[in-house]
Amino acid sequence: LSCIGMNQPHVMIGTAPAASSLLFRTEDEYSDHLFDQHSWAPAIEYADSVGVDVINTSLGYYTFDDKSKNYRYRDLNGHFALMSRQASRIADKGMVLVCSAGNAGMGSWKKTTPPGDAENVITVGAIGKNGELAPFSSIGNTADNRIKPDVVAVGVFADIIGTDGQPSMANGTSFSSPIMCGMVTCLWQSRPELAAKQIIELVRQSGDRVDLPDNI
């Protein structure tokens, strides 16, 4: 949250410090089950009902306690995972979903985690402040050969306010995603006449590799 909403001059200012925020907790931190994805949907529906414009989701799934439910690369088509199907429809409701690409880049999985494979969402990878890709940042393409992540933001030594209320730094696409989410919020504020899908495409076109895209 501090990546977006912090507003303490000379300490830290987030990327959308004047935005109003709602927090939703949708998963059981002590287990990994498909049910967590079912819990996510009501949060999105409630956000829609109260007029939320931009949503950040710093979570993703590809392994579960029941290993038979683990996703495979061929499942990353934006339609197989329940959460990805739900995410793909958010822009049709007039909201923009910004989500973390995942931190599996150095493991055997490597790929973007659902819902980051969804269509009509902004999937965010991580870079350092020097512009270099974070080695842990999950990569694409999707199984149906769409470019993912869509863009990147700082996720290595990202500035945050810790749970103790003190300035700190952290690594992960869980931080690059809200940093980008705040930027998207300010962009939409400046161009309120644009629809959600137009904002998504505008952000994609802002990347410095838009003319020669790669999968990282």
Predicted regions and their residues:
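Structural detector of well-ordered beta-strand residues that form the stable sheet scaffold
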Residues: 22, 96-98, 123, 152, ...
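Glycine-rich, acidic and aromatic/proline-enriched surface loops and short helix-turn segments
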Residues: 6, 53, 57, 150-157, ...
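Subtilisin-like serine protease catalytic core
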Residues: 1-36, 50, 66, 92-94, ...
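Hydrolase catalytic cores
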Residues: 1-3, 22-28, 111, 155-216
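Internal glycine-rich alpha/beta core junctions
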Residues: 137-158
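Glycine/Thr-rich phosphate-binding loops of Rossmann-like dinucleotide-binding domains
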Residues: 65, 131-133
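Substrate-binding/access-modulating region of protease and related hydrolase catalytic domains
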Residues: 26-117, 145-146, 163-177
